[in-house]
Amino acid sequence: MKGRSLNAEDRARLEAAIGYQFAEKERLDRALTHSSARSGRAINYQRLEFLGDRILGLCVAELLFQTFSDANEGELSVRLNQLVSAESCAKVADELSLHEFIRTGSDVKKITGKHMMNVRADVVESLIAAIYLDGGLEAARRFVLEHWTHRAASADGARRDAKTELQEWAHARFGVAPKYRTEDRSGPDHDPRFTVTVEVDGIDPETGVDRSKRGAEQVAAMKLLEREGVWQKRSAGN
């Protein structure tokens, strides 16, 4: 969807998909508006995304705390990072077909595809914030539980911290320590994207992207461990 707002039919279809009816329809429009859709009032989802990220983290942390009563802080953190990642949020967006409703400028060709994963993830967080502002925390929590409870149950929390695992594996296999290098930092200050490369002498490097430097390091380490067969690669449904 390009610059136009939702019509009544589209709004009803989307509200049915997400299981929530907005009292203030403008909140839903804002949550779906990418910064490239330059309207006269320059309304977009960036501020909502900032809030939605925190609400999602709270609701998922609460879910994990209640579900995995025997898990320690480290395991809970691993599970949390998996569940609130851009990849997980983008999968929720795809399940809801949000790409059909996102408002963009004419210079944005398409929202689908891996290279636009962050946009779809951002819209999910913005949608959570819009629901929170319109209906309160309980409404936002219901949405999160609907789409994250089964993910929490299937998340591979048994995995250790990826950087720790890679450190020990690289030392045992090659007698060296991994080296991490920050390749790029992009995005606005409130929502940065870090690109980090991890190198282990003797094998090809891997690159990770995340909203924090540490997160990007973890993603890069995880990808290398999966590529080398140290960790089993997670299925697309998890």
From Swiss-Prot:
| Assigned GO CC terms | cytoplasm
UniProt-annotated stretches for the region Disordered: 180-215
Q: Name one GO biological process term.
A: mRNA processing
Q: Which reaction does it catalyse?
A: Endonucleolytic cleavage to 5'-phosphomonoester
The protein's predominant localisation is cytoplasm
Domain called RNase III: residue spans: 11-136
Q: Indicate the residues that form the catalytic site.
A: D53, E125
This protein's assembly is summarised as: Homodimer.
Q: What is this protein called?
A: Ribonuclease 3
Supply the source organism for this entry.
Sinorhizobium medicae (strain WSM419) (Ensifer medicae)
